[in-house]
From Swiss-Prot:
It is an enzyme of class 2 (transferase). Its main location: cytoplasm. The gene is queA. It catalyses: 7-aminomethyl-7-carbaguanosine(34) in tRNA + S-adenosyl-L-methionine = epoxyqueuosine(34) in tRNA + adenine + L-methionine + 2 H(+). Pathway: tRNA modification; tRNA-queuosine biosynthesis. InterPro entries: QueA (IPR003699), QueA_dom1 (IPR042118), QueA_dom2 (IPR042119), QueA_sf (IPR036100). This is S-adenosylmethionine:tRNA ribosyltransferase-isomerase. GO terms for cellular component: cytoplasm. PANTHER family: S-ADENOSYLMETHIONINE:TRNA RIBOSYLTRANSFERASE-ISOMERASE (PTHR30307:SF0). Monomer. Keywords: Cytoplasm, Queuosine biosynthesis, S-adenosyl-L-methionine, Transferase. GO terms for molecular function: S-adenosylmethionine:tRNA ribosyltransferase-isomerase activity. GO terms for biological process: queuosine biosynthetic process; tRNA wobble guanine modification.
C-alpha cells in the first residue's frame, strides 16, 4: 500500500498541548455505528464482566538531557548498564570522546551514527543511570508539545563544566527568574506524562492510552468483574520517526524491548480459552501481545520486537483496542487501520476532527473493535 493512502487533514489546533483537567475527564470516542462521544470515566459502561484489560506498565524515564548551550540529547535504547543510544540535536556540535559534566558525573559521546543518532556512556559517581536521569534529566515530551514559557526552551543555555556545576547554575537560574517549583510545567508533566500504574523504568515516551486511567476507574473495573494484566514494552524514540517510503512495506521499523511474565501469559491464554474479550490498552500493548503470540498461544519471555502491523495483518489476541488519536501517515494510524478497518478509521477520524477531539499524546481516546 502507498503511504499517501494513510493521509488526512488534521487542523493544528487539535494537537493537544496539555492534558485534560483530570486524567479521566478526557473525551472517549466509541467506534460504534454511529460513533458515540462520551467521557473517559464512562468507559466502564462499554466493558462487561469477564473482560480482560492488558496494560503496559513501562515507566517513562527523564530521558532528555541538555549537554551544552543549545545541544540536547534524547535517550532512545539501553545498550548496557552504562551505555545508551540517543538522538542528538544538533549533532554537528558533538564529537566522539566529548565529555559533559553534571556535578561529579560525566556523559561521554562514544559514537556518531546516522540520522542524528549517537551512542553515549555514563561515568557516574555511585548512582545508577536512572537515578542520574531522575536528578538531571527532563521528561521527553514530544516535539509537537510546545511550551513558550517552559524550562524546556531555557535550560539549553546552561552549560555544564567541572568548574561550574549543573545544580548550582540551574538553581541560580530559577532564583534569578523567580521560577517556583523549578517550573510548574515540569512538575506537572512529571506526573501527567506517566501512567498511574507504571513500574518498570525504560520508556522514553509514554504509552499514552494508559494516561487516562485513575485509581477510581481501576477500582470500579475490578468491582464489575473486569480483569487486568500487565506486560512491558519500553517505548523508544523511534515511535515518532516518520515513514519516508511511499511503499509502506519498505519502511524499516524501529526495535523496542518487550516482556511478558508467565503470570500474564497464563491470564491472557485463559481469557482466550474461555472466549472472554481481551482489550489491549494502547498500541504498545497490542504490538507486544501479537509479538508473543504463536498459533494463538502467548508464551512468556522478553526480546526486542520490530513488529510492523499494516492492513492485512492477522490478529490473534486482542478483540478491542483502546488508543489515542494518531498522526496522519504514521505507523500507528496504519496499525489501527489494520485492526479496525481502513475505510472505517478514515471515517472515524473525520468524525473526531469534526467534533474537535484532541489528538496525540495528551489528547483524547478511542475504543476500537477488531474488524
Amino acid at each position: 500500500m502507498k503511504l499517501s493512502a494513510f493521509d488526512f487533514n488534521l487542523p493544528s489546533e487539535l494537537i493537544a498541548q496539555s492534558p485534560s483537567s483530570e486524567r479521566d475527564n478526557s473525551d472517549l470516542l466509541i467506534a460504534a455505528m454511529p460513533p458515540i462521544k462520551t467521557k473517559f470515566y464512562n468507559i466502564i459502561d462499554y466493558l462487561k464482566e469477564g473482560d480482560l484489560l492488558v496494560l503496559n506498565n513501562s515507566k517513562v524515564i527523564k530521558a532528555k538531557l541538555h549537554l551544552w548551550k543549545n545541544v540536547t540529547i534524547n535517550l532512545n535504547q539501553k545498550l548496557s548498564d552504562d551505555s545508551w543510544s540517543a538522538f542528538a540535536k544538533p549533532t554537528r556540535k558533538l564529537h566522539v570522546n566529548d565529555e559533559f559534566y553534571f556535578d561529579n558525573h560525566k556523559v561521554i559521546i562514544t559514537e556518531k551514527l546516522v540520522m542524528g543518532e549517537i551512542k553515549v556512556k555514563f561515568d557516574l559517581d555511585n548512582i545508577s543511570v536512572f537515578e542520574f536521569l531522575d536528578k538531571y534529566g527532563e521528561m521527553p515530551l514530544p516535539v509537537y508539545i510546545r511550551r513558550s514559557h517552559s524550562l524546556y526552551h531555557t535550560t539549553s543555555t546552561l552549560c555544564h563544566t567541572r568548574e561550574n556545576g549543573y545544580s548550582e547554575k540551574l538553581d541560580a537560574f530559577f532564583r534569578r527568574n523567580d521560577i517556583k517549583d523549578k517550573d510548574n510545567d515540569i512538575v506537572y508533566d512529571n506526573e501527567r506524562y506517566q501512567t498511574i500504574y507504571s513500574q518498570i523504568e525504560g520508556s522514553v515516551a509514554a504509552p499514552t492510552a494508559g494516561l487516562h486511567f485513575t485509581n477510581d476507574i481501576l477500582d470500579k473495573l475490578k468491582t464489575k468483574g473486569i480483569h487486568t494484566a500487565f506486560l512491558t514494552l519500553h517505548v523508544g524514540a523511534g515511535t515518532f520517526l516518520p515513514v519516508k517510503t511511499e511503499n509502506i512495506h519498505e519502511h524499516k521499523m524501529h526495535t523496542e524491548y518487550c516482556s511478558i511474565t508467565p503470570e500474564t501469559a497464563e491470564i491472557i491464554n485463559k481469557a482466550k480459552q474461555e472466549r472472554r474479550r481481551i482489550i489491549a490498552v494502547g498500541t504498545t500493548t497490542l504490538r507486544t501481545v501479537e509479538s508473543f503470540c504463536n498459533n494463538g498461544i502467548i508464551k512468556a519471555g522478553s526480546f526486542e520486537t520490530d513488529i510492523f502491523i499494516t492492513p492485512g495483518f492477522k490478529f490473534q489476541t486482542a478483540d478491542m483496542l483502546l488508543t489515542n488519536f494518531h498522526f496522519p501517515k504514521s505507523t500507528l494510524f496504519m496499525l489501527i487501520c489494520a485492526f479496525a478497518g481502513f475505510k472505517e478509521m478514515h471515517e472515524l477520524y473525520k468524525y473526531a476532527i469534526k467534533e474537535k477531539m484532541r489528538f496525540f499524546s495528551y489528547g483524547d481516546a478511542t475504543l476500537l473493535y477488531r474488524k
